[in-house]
């Protein structure tokens, strides 16, 4: 019986300085990846977020995917990165009435997932007013995320809710509570150690947030931070565009070796659960930000992505988690000579 393994992927735009499709795909193919998550890309008419792609651009990307041997792991859409309430709070976050958002943006993300033949959409848990307690807005966030999960479910898709600063679901505990209340098979959670560390959590606290998220886990973003941030208030507002200490998974305080060793024991059951929804397995999606990151993305460059991937593979080897990078047999299969 084959050993359960993880599927390696990356936010492709992080591997490219100019975000062109060829640059992104060349870097990932050279690193041996077979999957990528699609966020921002230039197909010849300037850099666009995935949500803005035209059908002609989608078709061009699909042809390039075939050429470079890549498949989409997830649509890395900014779904849920808008305000819950139409209230001025000193941020630049947009507000969109939810009925309109569900009918337009969420529907568009579902269409994109089908166009790129993936079952996964990455998203977020909405911004409460800047200085409010996120707990005070759980009810509305749960209601809206439940409707998003149902929209994805009706399209045979799964919505992954990422933990991130400043959102309602800014901690593992809060995301776990959202997941419990929504209670929908199309909603899973996306763990990200750096997104917790940068809010002032200690390594021991990051482990507790991981444990809270495990029952709802769908996949993991691989990003680490050099040291806990002194924020004054754990879980308080974070100026995301000023964060500067992102590091590979073998250099940070996120405890990835312990977390991934724990994930190893979850892989058989979690893989089966995801496969029942048409998802090929458990993704580890590299989003290293090693050249910098902010609210709507980050950059690593082709060399930085390579450094981050090698760091992750070293951690996986120590944690005894199986994975696969393209090898000569894959090349022969692509040539049609096997």
Model-inferred region functions:
Residues 2-9, 17-34, 66, 172-338:
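Histidine-acidic metal/acid-base catalytic patches
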Residues 9-23, 57-61, 104-106:
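N-terminal-biased segments
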Residues 11-13, 27, 31-55, 76:
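N-terminal substrate-binding region of glycoside hydrolase catalytic domains
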Residues 12-16, 40-42, 78-81, 125-130, ...:
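Active-site-proximal loop/turn and secondary-structure-junction residues that shape catalytic pockets
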Residues 22, 26-27, 67, 82-191, ...:
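Active-site acidic/histidine proton-transfer and metal-coordination neighborhood
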Residues 37-38, 72-77, 118-125, 158-162, ...:
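Short beta-strand segments at enzyme active-site cores
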Residues 42-56, 79-103, 125-137, 235-247, ...:
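Surface-exposed, active-site-proximal loop segments in enzymatic domains
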Residues 55-77, 142-155, 181-182, 254-261:
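Alpha-helix-loop-beta-strand connector modules within alpha/beta enzyme cores
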């Amino acid at each position: 019986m084959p050993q359960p393994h993880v599927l390696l992927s990356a936010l492709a735009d992080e591997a490219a300085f100019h975000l062109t499709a060829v640059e992104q795909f060349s870097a990932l193919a050279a690193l041996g990846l077979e999957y990528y998550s699609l966020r921002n890309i230039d197909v010849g008419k300037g850099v666009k977020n995935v949500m803005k792609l035209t059908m002609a651009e989608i078709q061009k990307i699909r042809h390039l995917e075939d050429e470079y041997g890549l498949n989409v792991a997830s649509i890395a859409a900014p779904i849920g990165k808008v305000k819950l309430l139409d209230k001025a709070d000193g941020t630049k976050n947009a507000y969109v009435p939810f009925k309109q958002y569900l009918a337009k943006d969420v529907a568009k993300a579902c269409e994109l997932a089908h166009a790129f033949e993936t079952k996964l959409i990455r998203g977020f848990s909405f911004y409460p007013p800047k200085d409010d307690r996120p707990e005070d807005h759980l009810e509305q966030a749960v209601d809206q995320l439940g409707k998003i999960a149902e929209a994805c479910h009706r399209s045979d898709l799964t919505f992954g809710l990422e933990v991130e600063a400043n959102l309602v679901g800014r901690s593992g505990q809060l995301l776990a509570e959202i997941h419990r209340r929504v209670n929908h098979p199309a909603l899973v959670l996306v763990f990200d150690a750096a997104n917790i560390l940068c809010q002032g959590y200690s390594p021991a606290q990051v482990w507790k947030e991981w444990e809270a998220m495990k029952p709802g886990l769908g996949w993991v973003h691989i990003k680490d931070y050099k040291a806990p941030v002194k924020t004054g208030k754990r879980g308080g507002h974070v100026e995301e565009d000023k964060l500067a200490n992102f590091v590979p998974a073998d250099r940070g305080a996120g405890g990835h070796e312990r977390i991934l060793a724990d994930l190893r024991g979850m892989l058989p059951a979690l893989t089966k659960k995801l496969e029942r929804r048409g998802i090929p397995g458990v993704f580890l999606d590299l989003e290293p930000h090693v050249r910098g990151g902010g609210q709507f993305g980050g950059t690593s460059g082709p060399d930085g992505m390579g450094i981050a991937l090698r760091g992750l593979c070293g951690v996986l080897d120590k944690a005894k988690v199986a994975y696969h990078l393209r090898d000569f047999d894959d090349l022969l299969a692509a040539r049609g000579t096997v």
